[in-house]
Design a protein with these regions (language model features):
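A short, conserved structural fragment
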Residues: 89-99
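Short amphipathic alpha-helical interaction segments
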Residues: 74-86
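Minor-groove-contacting beta-hairpin "wing" of winged helix-turn-helix DNA-binding domains
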Residues: 100-105
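Short helix-coil junctions and helix-kink-helix linkers
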Residues: 36, 68-77
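Short alpha-helical segments that sit at the start of domains
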Residues: 22-58
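Short acidic, hydrophobic short linear motifs in intrinsically disordered regions
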Residues: 58-71
């Protein structure tokens, strides 16, 4: 019965991609895909964080030092603590209470974030 109800609902259509906004988001990254500066707009922070999330190997456990190294390799404003905290607060990364162990949370990024990830990786 639950499956039947689900089938009867109209399919959810994702919001169209705002290509002007996507172009603005690419300005936060250099030609090598490294994040240059922290966005002041909250709506720009999330897609940029998804880019870093996509570069964390899935199903692996990282020490604080290891995740810092991965983050530093992918951003140029040298604030891995900010990035760790934001990714944890937004449910992209989980960490132990003592902050020693981190793991990427497997979730589907937003359509804008997915498009940005593909664009920066050269897959668009």
């Amino acid at each position: 019965m639950v499956a039947e109800k689900r089938l009867m609902r109209p399919a959810e259509v994702p919001a169209p991609i705002d290509y002007v906004e996507l172009q603005r988001l690419t300005r936060y990254f250099d030609v090598n895909g490294r994040w240059i500066r922290w966005p002041t707009k909250f709506s720009h922070q999330d897609p940029c964080l998804w880019v870093l999330w996509s570069r964390l190997p899935p199903r692996q456990i990282f020490s604080e030092r290891e995740i810092n190294e991965l983050l530093r390799a992918n951003h140029l404003f040298d604030d891995p603590a900010l990035l760790r905290r934001e990714m944890t607060d937004r449910g992209m990364v989980r960490r132990t209470l003592d902050g020693r162990v981190y793991k990427r949370v497997e979730r589907r990024p937003t359509l804008t974030a997915l498009t940005l990830i593909r664009l920066l990786s050269g897959n668009l």
